[in-house]
């Protein structure tokens, strides 16, 4: 996130092909100027009015935090003639600043079943961010709760969906705990690129 193209090109030359960005404008500019075999993941809070800009090329949207957003991604994807891969974001941290469904809100949305009519999105898993704390036990507990919720959701609503397999959790400071709890996608930036410039 927010790292210059040169830093991404260096990682690209080392073999990295999946990159994440949290700002639509930033990601679109990078998509346009960097190699086209890069797989772009959108990992920030996505506003409905910005979806149309990333739908043509985004590989995975990590932060779907409402049915309204999911429906809008579907609408824009239909216009672009695409199916967009999405992760549902769960609020697992003890911080108000983080976005996401509560476990109950997510259960309600999935049980309601409206999402099944959205033919241009594919729900591929869940995403969550742990509390930004030095308390390793708390981080482990939060990741384990999301991992166990993932298993519940998979069994209830996606048992036959091979594509429902991603659990995006863990960043530079807590990815060890995330992997131990079952993460399949870690979002590591500063450990690779150094601290970013805001």
List the model feature ranges, each with a label.
Residues 2-173, 179-181, 193-195:
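Conserved alpha/beta-domain cores
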């Amino acid at each position: 996130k927010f790292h210059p193209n040169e830093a991404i090109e260096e990682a690209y030359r080392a073999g990295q092909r999946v990159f994440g960005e949290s700002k639509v404008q930033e990601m679109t500019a990078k998509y346009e100027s960097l190699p086209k075999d890069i797989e772009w993941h959108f990992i920030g809070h996505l506003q409905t009015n910005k979806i149309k800009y990333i739908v043509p090329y985004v590989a995975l949207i990590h932060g779907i935090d409402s049915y309204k957003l999911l429906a809008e991604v579907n609408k824009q994807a239909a216009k672009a003639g695409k199916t967009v891969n999405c992760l549902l974001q769960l609020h697992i941290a003890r911080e108000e600043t983080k976005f996401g469904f509560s476990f109950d809100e997510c259960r309600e949305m999935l049980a309601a079943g409206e999402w099944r009519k959205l033919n241009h999105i594919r729900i591929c898993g869940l995403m969550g961010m742990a509390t930004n704390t030095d308390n390793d036990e708390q981080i482990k507990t939060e990741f384990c709760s999301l991992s166990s919720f993932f298993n519940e959701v998979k069994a209830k609503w996606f048992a036959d969906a091979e594509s429902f397999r991603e659990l995006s959790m863990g960043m530079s400071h807590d990815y060890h705990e995330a992997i131990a709890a079952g993460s399949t996608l870690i979002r590591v930036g500063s450990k690779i690129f150094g601290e970013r410039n805001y």
